[in-house]
């Protein structure tokens, strides 16, 4: 600013000097006319000279203004250039996906992964050892272990023969190597699941917290770390379970376009590994995807056929004997059983009801959750709320199975996304404050409890038992019932949502049609 003022003063001084000099020169050059009177000697010339001086002064002032304007424009241009210069980037900013904000998210995921790999090298992981020994039994033949009779760490092989064939490569690995392999797979799938969730959210124009600061890959790393730290994924890693693989197969089948390969192929393979994914046939049925249902049946039948073709004796044993023996999986009242049967036995109802009466209650609650799920799928399908469709069907699957351990619920991230971003916006647009508050309390308590896991909840509500004594917590106690309370609260939340839908059916249907039209328009505009 000081430079501008000095320039301005200099221009004004020069202009004043020029105008004075021009005036003096004009007066000196005025001619003297001999025959004119003395009083009028300079009169005829003075008026034009004064006029000329005024014009020149005006011209000088105009040039000063022009110079000032040019100087200001030059300064403004220099300032703009300075501002337009890109800020100096740090080393991490030059790496794709490593913005300074995202760096912390990447580091968090790396720390979670390092902790997981360090943990599994020092802690027991029973399930992966069962898978490995199942593969060893096939490799050793009739003279070695028998697939459905051996036990390792007290646990038998409970999966179909097709699963044992897929586990066959584990026979060439040691127990620690197999554990590290399954942990690496879980690590990759947690990141892939986070990528799918974030991409799905962006395609629906959802704004997520910290999205502006972390960027795309920073958000993916943060979501992946949070997924891996939740109760179901922690325990899946602890046991070396295949639940993340089952999730990946089903997600890949439903999130891909069903073009050349019809939907249902991967779902059938998942059911061939573990029977419970057959429950997703209800989703195909409510979509009226007859081709998908046929493909699911054919794919599942192919896995059964491969089992009979390769290991006939083991297949006969499983399909005609082992599949009916639920005691091979565990006992119903185990603290980690989150199914309907687990809820009933945790409450100790088996001691107050006959076996028949207990079965009637279980069947009634099973039919209720199946009916409610089928009804709620209608508006969710119409609104193309895919996360909610998958999450609701997965919850039904966990509930109707006689035994569902909490680590089977690797669907938790989808449940959280579905409740917050699809079910509430679609179903709870115009409800009373009481109903809305009730739904928020039920959903929040359920989702927070699922994240923690039954193990820690049981210990929190059982002050006289420690971790080594958790199996001694008695049936019917508050501590044992509290462990699976989050799943009971989610069941109640779904029932409340069901009645809200029935009471506001037309409004929900209009909202579903609007959501469908908006997604169709967005897809067309792309």
Predicted regions and their residues:
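Perimembrane helix-loop-helix junctions
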Residues: 278-304, 422-427
